[in-house]
Regions:
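Active-site-proximal loop/turn and secondary-structure-junction residues that shape catalytic pockets
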Residues: 86-90, 134, 233-235
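Well-ordered mid-protein domain cores that form the structural environment of catalytic cofactors
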Residues: 55-124
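Short proline/glycine- and acidic-rich turn/helix-capping motifs at secondary-structure junctions
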Residues: 88-91, 159-170, 263-271
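Short alpha-helix boundary/capping motifs
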Residues: 38, 99-103, 156, 173, ...
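C-terminal accessory/tail domains of diverse enzymes
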Residues: 1-78, 110, 177-376
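Core alpha/beta catalytic barrel or barrel-like domain that forms the active/cofactor pocket
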Residues: 41-47, 80-92, 118-129, 159-160, ...
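Metal-dependent DNA replication initiation modules
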Residues: 105, 109-126, 130-186, 190
Length: 376
């Protein structure tokens, strides 16, 4: 049994659609409910939501929807709204207040160490936690789960614009985050003991605080013991989130079976994975993907068909398999939210209208998938 949990970083906007500081000194509107809890982040224009531990993907999506509703109500209590995307298209980081000073020692220490790297990393991700039973080969799974992280980045890509400019990328968010140390693609580790020994060394020489872990695209969480996948942009469509969670859960289950049967394949280097990560950041679901086991390149339909064939046997029944197969096919037709956002910005013609459209997608069950083939 693999359990699931989700964290989302949600943008707080004003009536113009621009990022705005939220007053976290005021009481949260039911900050902790059975489905999860809300928290602050380093930038005051962010609400972070955290679901409870979930047993299934449908349960996870129910909690994600309910936590987004909580964030909407929290924002509305101060006349604000929410927006869901990996980067805000127009707001500038220099204008965003931070949680700093003596009242926020954790964030103050980050700002003191990383300076404008932390101030300017105005990004919004979603983190999927996979929880394993005692004795599961978590590090062996993590080493190989790294291989498919660029694919889920492509499925989630939602940050083509930055400070009013089209960056030419599908996910600009990683251009902001990868400036941090101990960020990006994880190394492969021989064992959990070797991984923990490295973390302990970093703490001993002052690189990490006692309650800090690595910030890489996937990590063994230092408190929860989960595998935390951190590579994804936030995405307005809960169904796309469900597809990503399903693929990662089934891939982890497949890896666990292979490892226990002694059939695991080779572990790819960080350098090899970074090649596919760049392709995902640049081209999204139009990327040409490298299979480093074969040294071959394939287009997205063929590549994802091969991945689907690998993990689909993990479905609990034909109905579940058919449901997610249909949504994967839809995703490959619709392309990324970055594609759709570019198309809408061009069609609507100005940022104010585009931001209002984006905000409307964060309303309850308001997201209607749109194909973006015209931008090919």
């Amino acid at each position: 049994m693999i359990t699931l949990g989700m964290e989302e970083e949600i943008q707080i906007i004003d009536d113009r659609g621009e990022l705005v500081a939220h007053d976290f000194s005021a009481d949260f509107v039911e900050a902790t409910i059975p489905e999860g809890l809300m928290d602050k982040e380093i930038h005051r224009c962010v609400i972070e939501t955290k679901t409870r531990v979930c047993q299934t993907v449908p349960e996870l999506l129910s909690c994600v929807r309910l936590m987004r509703g909580q964030a909407r109500r929290q924002a509305a209590s101060q006349g604000q709204r929410i927006l869901i995307a990996g980067v805000h298209p127009t707001s500038t980081w220099q204008q965003q207040p931070l949680h700093e000073g003596a009242d926020f020692p954790h964030y103050a220490s980050l700002i003191d160490e990383y300076r404008d790297v932390s101030r300017s990393a105005l990004s919004f991700g979603m983190h999927l936690h996979l929880g394993f039973e005692l004795g599961a080969p978590r590090m062996a799974i993590m080493n190989r789960l790294r291989h498919v992280l660029p694919e889920v980045l492509a499925l989630s890509a939602s940050s083509p614009f930055f400070e009013g400019r089209d960056t030419g990328l599908q996910s600009w968010r990683h251009s902001l985050l990868d400036r941090y140390p101990r960020m990006g693609t994880s190394d492969a580790w021989e064992s959990e003991q070797h991984y923990q020994a490295h973390v302990d060394r970093l703490r001993a020489v002052g690189c990490l605080g006692e309650d800090q872990g690595l910030w890489q695209d996937i990590r063994l969480h230092h408190r929860y013991g989960t595998l935390e996948i951190r590579i994804m942009d936030t995405h307005p469509d809960p169904v796309r989130i469900g597809l990503i969670a399903t693929l990662l859960k089934w891939e982890a289950e497949t890896l666990q079976l292979e490892i226990r049967a002694g059939r695991q394949g080779p572990v790819w280097s960080r350098a090899c994975i970074d090649e596919n990560k760049w392709r995902a950041r640049r081209h999204g679901l139009r990327a040409q993907w490298i299979d480093w086991n074969r040294d071959t390149v394939s287009d997205t339909p063929k590549h994802f068909e091969r991945w689907w064939s690998r993990v689909a046997p993990r479905a609990k029944d034909p109905a579940e398999r058919s449901y997610w197969e249909r949504h994967l096919a839809d995703a490959l037709i619709q392309r990324t939210f970055a594609d759709v956002l570019r198309q809408q910005a061009l069609r609507l013609g100005d940022w104010k209208t585009t931001l209002q459209w984006m905000a409307s997608l964060a309303c309850d069950d308001a997201y209607v998938p749109q194909a973006a083939e015209a931008l090919a």
